[in-house]
Structures are given as C-alpha cells and as structure tokens.
C-alpha cells in the first residue's frame, strides 16, 4: 500500500511525469506506454520487461531517448538461464492450460470438449510448441488434468530430458514443419511456447494451417510478447482476450501473468 511505501521512506508523487522528472532510475514491470516516451530523459535508467522484438515503435522511441534500457527478459546468468523471465514464464505456462481448457467450452466458441475427458470418453489432445519453461509448465498442467500431450522442440537434448521427467501421457517429438502439419488435424488445444532470447518468435503455424484444424480448436500463443509463433496472432487484452479466424479460437493476451497478480508479484520478488 502507499502507507507501507511511506513507512519505508518512499515519497509518493501524484503523476508519472513527476516521477520521471526527478528519478535517475525507473523500475517498472511492463514496457513504457507511448504517453511516457516524451518523459524519458537521456541517461535515465529504465529497468523493466521491454520485449523489444514485438514493437518497432517502442524500440525506436527508446533509441531516440538515449536512455539506458535494461530488459528483464534478457538478463542472463553465467549458465544462460533467464532469472527474471523464468518466473513469469512459469506463471504463463500454467495459465495457458487453464484458459485453454476454459475456451474449449462450447459457450466460449470451443469444441465443447473436457480437457481430461471422463471414464469411457477420450481426453483432449494438446500440442505444446516449445519445450522451455513455458512449454514444460503447460505440459505438466495439461498432463495433470489427464490430457494427451505432445511437446515439440528442436533441441533433442531437451526432449530427452522431458521424456524422462514427464508422466506417461506426455510424448515428445522433434519439431519440423511436417510434424506440426501432421498433428494439427487431431489437436484440440495448441500452446505456443517458443522463445528465442531477445528475438522475434518464428511463425510455426501459418495462416493457411488454420484450415487443417477442426472448428473450435483453441490456440493460446504465450509467445505473443515476442511477436507470436502463430502467424494469425495479434495481441489481445484481459478485457477482450479472444477472437476467431476460420472458426479457430485465438487467445493472445500479452502479459498473461497480470491476471494473477498475487502469484506473479511474489514469483517476481523471489527471482
């Protein structure tokens, strides 16, 4: 609360402009809004999630400002792990299955299929594109609910590891365009979990691929913050999270962890 900040010695200012005017370093969670661009000063340090690969406008504005920009998502340890991106990826990966299962419901435009099935009725088929933190957490959640899960990745060593630690209803497959195309007709839920450090995600599912999927299939593109790994992905909001193209439900909310702030805040604080 504001009172707790004051007790700790912080000064509460009325507007963002007031803060930018006196601060040498700005610590945020999400990238600066367009309205904040004129407030940023030369040599001012900004520390936040930027996701530059998804926004030319943001990148150009920060370059023009001559500020020092440090992106949470590209801070690396010696072992190349991403300590500030990992907790949000864990949250987003688990959330992806929650929202995907919800939007598979008929009232939401989905197929009307229960993710885990019931005795005598087959569970849903879940395809996870990417075996990193997001993909691993998504696969765990989907498997725990009883779905049939396939993880695709181009890192064979990672696939071997996942094959050892995942339950029996999770299979792994080397990711190729052909493998993805072959999987799409029978898939019910696709999780886009591709990450290239600091770069735009490649499009693994193209516009024409939607025709291969059954109406009501749900796509959750967690990679939307980095441009999305599904060509038809465009950023949405928590207020208006989905849209349909060719009968395929797209959930492409940027900053998915923002929906669960009590969990996300604690996870980031502990990073």
Language-model features: where?
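Generic hydrophobic/aromatic pocket-lining and core-packing "Φ" positions
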Residues: 2, 59, 97, 138-139, ...
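Glycine-rich phosphate/diphosphate-binding loop of Rossmann-like nucleotide-binding domains
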Residues: 1-2, 107-192
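Rossmann-like adenosine-cofactor binding region
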Residues: 164-247
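An anion/phosphate-binding loop that grips the pyrophosphate of nucleotide cofactors and donors
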Residues: 22-23, 187
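Adenosine-phosphate binding glycine-rich loop
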Residues: 73-115, 224, 229-271
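Short glycine-/small-residue-rich Rossmann-like dinucleotide-binding loops
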Residues: 24, 30-31, 50-51, 176, ...
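Phosphate/diphosphate ligand-binding glycine-rich loop within oxidoreductases
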Residues: 25-103
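N-terminal beta-loop-helix "entrance" segment that forms/cooperates
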Residues: 1-11
